[in-house]
Amino acid sequence: MAMEITFLGTSSMVPTKERGQSGILLDCGKEKILFDCGESMQRQLRIAGIAPPKITRVFISHDHGDHIFGLPGLLENIAKNSAEKKIEIYGTVDFGKKLKQIFKSFEIGHKIDINFTAIEKNGVFLDTGDLQFGAHFLNHGVPCLGYYVREKDRICIDKVKMKKLKLPSGPIIAKLKSKKDVTFEGKKIKWKDVTFVKEGKKVSVVLDTAICSAAV
């Protein structure tokens, strides 16, 4: 699985001429994940050629303004231009309270189906089959999360051994990759003998924090 990272904002409390407030997009193909949503996020997405309705999940590190001020506009955009009109948002309990205020102030709640998940402990909190999502609390004075996205390890066929045994593509290969032994031309072939484990990629996003063990 290809993973592409786009830095949308790398400034801090005050944006500069060259840099916007916090925002990172991780493109995993079917999943397009936004980490933090600083001021002018819609503009940054447009510059990067990323359509807001394509975003599937938003992960907020903490509830300081430079990490969330772009959220109302982004949600309005998705509500108006997304066919599904829904999005998954994750963050701290404190951020969840501010998100409710955003719903009320901008009357967004009835326009789009927003599912908010509060992260209350360290570790994996979501498994989609292909990806695992986890978080750890950092050291920032207020509840603040660092996130990671891990691609699952995959069983792959050793093509050299496949060619040597003259194994055909198709059901036989599928069985071997699903950890099942097969019989081919009267010979039993053990899946462990012709496969290897390809370790999945892992991307960690650690934003505002002092040095702490959770950030490593």
Spans of features found by a protein language model:
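Active-site metal-binding loops of divalent metal-dependent hydrolases
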Residues: T10-S11, E39-S40, D63, D94, ...
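Active-site environment of divalent metal-dependent phosphoester hydrolases
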Residues: V14, G65-H67, G123, G141, ...
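Active-site-proximal loop/helix segment associated with metal-binding centers of metalloenzymes
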Residues: L131-V205, T209-V216
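Structured loop/turn residues at beta-strand edges in well-structured enzyme cores
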Residues: M1, I50-P53, I112, G129-L131
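Active-site metal-binding motif and surrounding structural segment of the metallo-beta-lactamase
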Residues: E39-Y90, N115-E120
